[in-house]
Each structure stands twice: as C-alpha cells, then as structure tokens.
Amino acid sequence: MKGLYQAAGRILVTLGILSVCSGVIAFFPVFSYKPWFTGWSVRIACPIWNGALAITTGVLLLLAYREWTQRYLGEATFTFVILSIMGCPLHFAIALESALLGPYCFYSFSGIAGTNYLGYAVTFPYPYAKFPLACVDPPHYEEYHLTLQALDLCLSFTLLCTSLTVFIKLSARLIQNGHINMQLPAGNPNPFSP
C-alpha cells in the first residue's frame, strides 16, 4: 500500500509538469517566435492550471507520505485531490471541443468579417485529412494543434484516474478511521496501511 501513494504522487507531479508544458507550448504556436501568434485563451490556460493543481496534489501527497505525523498535509492532499478531480473533466472537455472545432488560424480567415476560428468556417468535426492546408501561417499548424489536443486528452484522463484512485483510498481511510491520518498501532511502521 505504501507504494501506491508514492507512485500516485510521482505520477501526479510528472503529468502535471507535462500538462503545464503543454499549455506553455500552446502559447507559442509551432514554436513561433512571432509575438502576434501568442495569446491567452481557455484552451491554453486550462492545461496550465490543471497541471499546477496536479503538481500541488502530487507534492502534498509525497510530503504527506514522508511526514505522516503532520495532520495538515493529509487534509491538504485530500482537498487538492478533490480540486484536481473537478478540474480534469473540464480540461478533457476543453481539449475535446478544441480538437473537434479545429485550429485557431491567425491569418487564414481573419479580416473584417473573419472569426479566426476554422471551426466556424468548415464542417464539424474539423476534417483534418480533407482540409490540410487551411492555416497558411504558421505552417503545419493543424498537425501541431491536433497533437497538443490529443496530448491534453490523454493527460486529463490519466490525471483523473490517478486523482480518483487517491481520493477513493483517502475516503476509505476517512470512513474507516474517522480521519485521514491514522494513529499507528505499536509495531506498525507503515502510516498508509488501510
């Protein structure tokens, strides 16, 4: 059982870092240095904030495992696991919506009446194979966009599964003992045994 909490903490930290990196990379489309390509949107901010929640949850879980006598670490872990569970479906929904609508093209459909979103100009879901060169600048933006959204879908689902596992184990301990941190019986060195 002790390996479960360590593994879950490490998984949450690793996937949280990947999620933050995904949001930061999405900030600069196709690694472009052109400042007019940068911009905040809900698609970029959601992976960053969900990744920050996962990193915080993972670090608290690892610290709670290491210093199990500190009651506040277990309670903070439980709180952040709940927040992470609430953020993961939102992250998943935004990534799915973004993948289905298509990429945000900066110059393809812009203008006086343009919306900049290909999702409003082409059929739904976005036909990546039939309409490969809709975004003229930056090049290969469709593939870049689809790869980032697929990565976000996988990250959000894995973060949700890991957070749910930790939540279920901590909830079982809370129901069984009346609190998250348990008193150790004499001779039991493992604070995380059920």
Swiss-Prot record:
Compartments, as annotated in UniProt: Membrane
Predominant location: membrane
Sequence intervals crossing the membrane: 11-31, 44-64, 76-96, 99-119, 148-168
Lineage top rank: taxon: Eukaryota
GO annotation, cellular component aspect: membrane
Topological category with respect to the lipid bilayer: Multi-pass membrane protein
Keywords assigned: Membrane, Transmembrane, Transmembrane helix
Chain coiled-coil ranges: none
Name of protein: Transmembrane protein 212
UniProt organism field: Homo sapiens
